[in-house]
Amino acid sequence: MDPLRIAVLLPHLGVYGGIRRFLELGAVWTRRGHDVLIATPRSATAREAWLPFAGRTGDVERVPEERWDVLLSPDPDLFRSVSVPGALRAFYAVLEKAPRARAAWSVADLVFGNSAGMVRHLRRRGVRAVAAPGGVNLERFHPPAADVRRARARAGGPVRALVYGRLSRRRKGSLTAARAVEAASRRSGVPVELTLFDAPPPGSRPAGEGEGMDLGIRIPHRWVLRPTQEELASLYGDADLFVSAERRAGWCNTAAEAMACGAAVVCTRSGTEDFARDGFTAHVSRWPWAWSLARRMTPLLRDPALRARVAEAGREKIGEFTWERTADLLERGIRERLEGREHAAKAS
């Protein structure tokens, strides 16, 4: 097959899970010999890729100067503002109820959804979306070589819980997750040590820095701010439990990464339906409320063997979701639409 020319339009290259997705995909496509450009506006606050990326980066404003097979973007405003004659316009929906997303769907040649939940959300609104679930970099995120979690459980020490601490975004549910950990510890009588981590955008001041923010919880807790990728993998690999209370997520990167590193996951259904099967690969709360999450967490605190079984099943399941697989699904959808357009042109 001929290489594809793919222009990815992003609002910035800052430290966000949604940006990770396209840096990972761009790296896969570049290794496969495709011509990939990740383009951001000249006015973007973060224009340096925060993950290693061997492909091209450049200006959104200059994208129309080249020939492209496809323009791919998750950002409704950028997607609508850029067009190139002959290029397929593919919108990648990554967030439920994203502002102005409906306007992007209406002009797209092709719409992808980044999870089963997102595809269902789109189809309820009359959009024929193609499923392209997210992935995990399994070379980076895996259990530590010397995994001490089972030995630590046998010794009877506190359970270590981990929460993504992006308090500035309420839909992430970070405060709800922290309160759920406290409630489950109190209900089960099992001591818990909680770690919250965040890599806030430039110019913002996260909770946990300076005077921080009072979480209103009375269990031991600490913040880890701006961890490197190696430090993040280490945090996941040290956690007995990872707790997520997200709402309106497309694909929950943090839950997937924690699962890949061998943590037992307690989560909502938001962004996790593809890999979190309740009672098997994770404990899933029906509602994004602290009491509901605490109820699903309590058995895992009380029973280390159950916690280990769920963690192992989760790690096996998430191993199916590589970025190479996601790249395959996107590439297949793009090629099928390009071929269909070519056949239609010949027939007319």
Whereabouts are the PLM-identified features?
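Conserved acidic donor-binding segment of nucleotide-sugar-dependent glycosyltransferases
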Residues: 278-290, 299-304
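A short, well-ordered alpha-helix in the C-terminal region of glycosyltransferases
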Residues: 299, 306-320, 332
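Aromatic "clamp/platform" in nucleotide-sugar-dependent glycosyltransferases that forms part
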Residues: 247
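Conserved donor-binding/catalytic core segment of Leloir-type glycosyltransferases
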Residues: 152-172, 178-182
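Short hydrophobic beta-strand element within catalytic cores of glycosyltransferases
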Residues: 264-267
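Donor nucleotide-sugar binding/catalytic pocket of nucleotide-sugar-dependent glycosyltransferases
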Residues: 109-144
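Short alpha-helical donor nucleotide-sugar binding micro-motif in glycosyltransferases
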Residues: 234-239
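Nucleotide-activated donor-binding/catalytic signature segment of Leloir-type glycosyltransferases, i.e.
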Residues: 207-230
